């Protein structure tokens, strides 16, 4: 049964007024909030009542969600277009029960690879790994893009108070040379270790940056042997890794059953471990595993990722919401929105179902946002007074790592105030009376009042963490991962392929050839607009 069928439209006819719902039900917060260990999930400010929630939960039951959850965790090839299992969860699974994929127990493989990464991290941190000149490594430069960059970069920044290794970790992703140069300007070739993170070892941006980094290193050493002391790889293409000059002993695995946007739990998370130490990296995995268990074992009515997905899908199907705002009120989560944009939009930005049929309902939404309180002085105006329906997720941390309690209290007060303002707003009469009290006459108050009305009744969810630790961050990420999966099930789409990104890559290669040879077939096949753009560049 499709989640987005016509029966969902009538739910809007419930005409939920949040202020009224709170006034008439003093148990509303208790009913519409959940807790998982150190995470409190308050969804009471959403446009739901008992009847709507019951209807949404019934739809989840009818969607075969329970079976799909089992299939994913048991290694079924739910990525149907690429014939792959989806098992990023296996990377953080603490159980020893065999998990067979294509005839192999991947538990053993995962354990072995984790140990290899741990040994590398400890070797570099302890100083036993040395650069070509014999100096200790002081800087790590991670070269990757997409999931090989966004996840690790987000976690390294979020867990900055847990950095404990004296290693500085840098990230290079964009093919724009400025991305690479920013890192190279602050590191020393004799004390830098590069991580090349590319499953295919042919991703254009990563390969070009890696080649340039290699040239930079060899300009200093003038000896090819230096590459082995200053580069490691995470790839499945051993021949290309060896050709680059990297010792295969220092090539770490990427499995087909781990998608790039879900790969920070794998060897791709090596840069995280270099920053926070391997013990803390394991706590990150443990936090995610705790949510995996919650997701697998908890009934839907108390299952946080399921409720998250039901709410988002409900707004998409019933209110035609086309975007979702994500507002973390913690500076350490400044890359969290970027990370989730890929995880969510690359997963569920689809227009055909699993059978390949064009869907007649809305699927993925535009996920956007930024850290509070910055957003309040930028885009919150649209949230409060715009005429676009935008559900909001607030993420707040109860206690911070610093001792500036007055800052933390102000931050949290602003977060809670924003969710309250979205819910209650302020009516014309309220504004008008306030203006009169401020000294305006009746005419002036009437002229200004309409401009200050805030409609309110705009839905939001608040996720409150006790603290931002490796464990709690792992749990938070996993909540959103599973939310994305559930939405894909509800919409009957494949959340684990990303064919939409391939055409641009292909055309980019053709255009690069055309830019270098205007007699080529690639140039002759260009449209007039693209040809003119190339001409403008050449004639600059």
Swiss-Prot record:
InterPro entries: G6P_Isomerase (IPR001672), G6P_Isomerase_C (IPR023096), Phosphoglucose_isomerase_CS (IPR018189), SIS_dom_sf (IPR046348), SIS_PGI_1 (IPR035476), SIS_PGI_2 (IPR035482). Its EC number is 5.3.1.9. GO terms for biological process: gluconeogenesis; glucose 6-phosphate metabolic process; glycolytic process. It catalyses: alpha-D-glucose 6-phosphate = beta-D-fructose 6-phosphate. It is found in: Cytoplasm. It is an enzyme of class 5 (isomerase). GO terms for cellular component: cytosol. Its main location: cytoplasm. Pathway: Carbohydrate biosynthesis; gluconeogenesis; Carbohydrate degradation; glycolysis; D-glyceraldehyde 3-phosphate and glycerone phosphate from D-glucose: step 2/4. Keywords: Cytoplasm, Gluconeogenesis, Glycolysis, Isomerase. Catalyzes the reversible isomerization of glucose-6-phosphate to fructose-6-phosphate. This is Glucose-6-phosphate isomerase. The gene is pgi.
